[in-house]
């Protein structure tokens, strides 16, 4: 009897999941095959959101596709986004390339544009914000002076630790590692380990040395 009820419960779950995904497809620009989208997720302007195949979007995630472009948020193949992260194109765009992973409670603001490369890991509670408030005139409150925007580019195979902040205009090269808690205020080329507030280069990642050492 217990196994019978388990089968019924599993069947209902499969049917509900299928119907939920079909319902979402009515509104989204595109949702790829084999993508898992958990319930209790908030979407805004879903007709400007693309989710490719084999993605996992966990509960509590907020994705806002509002943009002046046709696509505000592009999520590549095999991307995972952990619980309670907030991704907002904010009239710009957020592009997350294939097989990258966004940790829990991250905030990505795409007002000035955010590009994240392939196989990149972003630790929990990281802020990636491509805009900032102006502060040119002391006679006008900062909140009324508008914003300035600069694109953020994060390369392929980058590992960003938890609790980092990436500021507008920053480019992080391929294969970089950003230590937890770092505040990245300027750009860095490929193959560096970076840490601190403000973040500075700590060492070069020498892949030829690593491979030769492992071979021995």
PLM-predicted stretches and their roles:
Residues 44-51, 56-166, 205-206, 210:
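Flexible, glycine/small-residue-enriched loop-and-beta-strand segment within the central core
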Residues 37:
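Conserved catalytic Walker-motif region of ABC-type ATPase nucleotide-binding domains
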Residues 184-185:
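Short hydrophobic beta-strand element within catalytic cores of glycosyltransferases
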């Amino acid at each position: 009897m217990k196994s019978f009820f388990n089968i019924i419960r599993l069947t209902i779950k499969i049917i509900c999941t299928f119907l939920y995904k079909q319902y979402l497809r009515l509104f989204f620009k595109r949702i790829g095959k084999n993508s898992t989208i958990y319930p209790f997720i908030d979407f805004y302007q879903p007709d400007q959101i693309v989710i490719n195949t084999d993605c996992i979007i966990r509960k509590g995630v907020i994705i806002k596709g509002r943009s002046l472009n046709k696509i505000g948020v592009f999520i590549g193949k095999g991307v995972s986004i952990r619980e309670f992260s907030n991704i907002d194109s904010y009239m710009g765009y957020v592009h997350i390339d294939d097989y990258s992973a966004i940790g829990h409670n991250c905030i990505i603001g795409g007002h000035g544009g955010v590009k994240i490369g392939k196989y990149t890991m972003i630790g929990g509670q990281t802020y990636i914000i491509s805009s900032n408030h102006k502060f040119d005139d002391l006679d006008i409150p900062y909140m009324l002076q508008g914003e300035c925007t600069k694109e953020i580019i994060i390369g392929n195979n980058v590992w960003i630790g938890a609790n980092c902040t990436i500021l507008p205009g920053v480019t992080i090269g391929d294969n970089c590692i950003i230590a937890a808690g770092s505040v990245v205020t300027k750009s860095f080329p490929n193959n560096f380990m970076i840490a601190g507030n403000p973040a500075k280069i700590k060492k070069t990642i020498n892949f030829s040395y690593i491979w030769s050492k492992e071979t021995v």
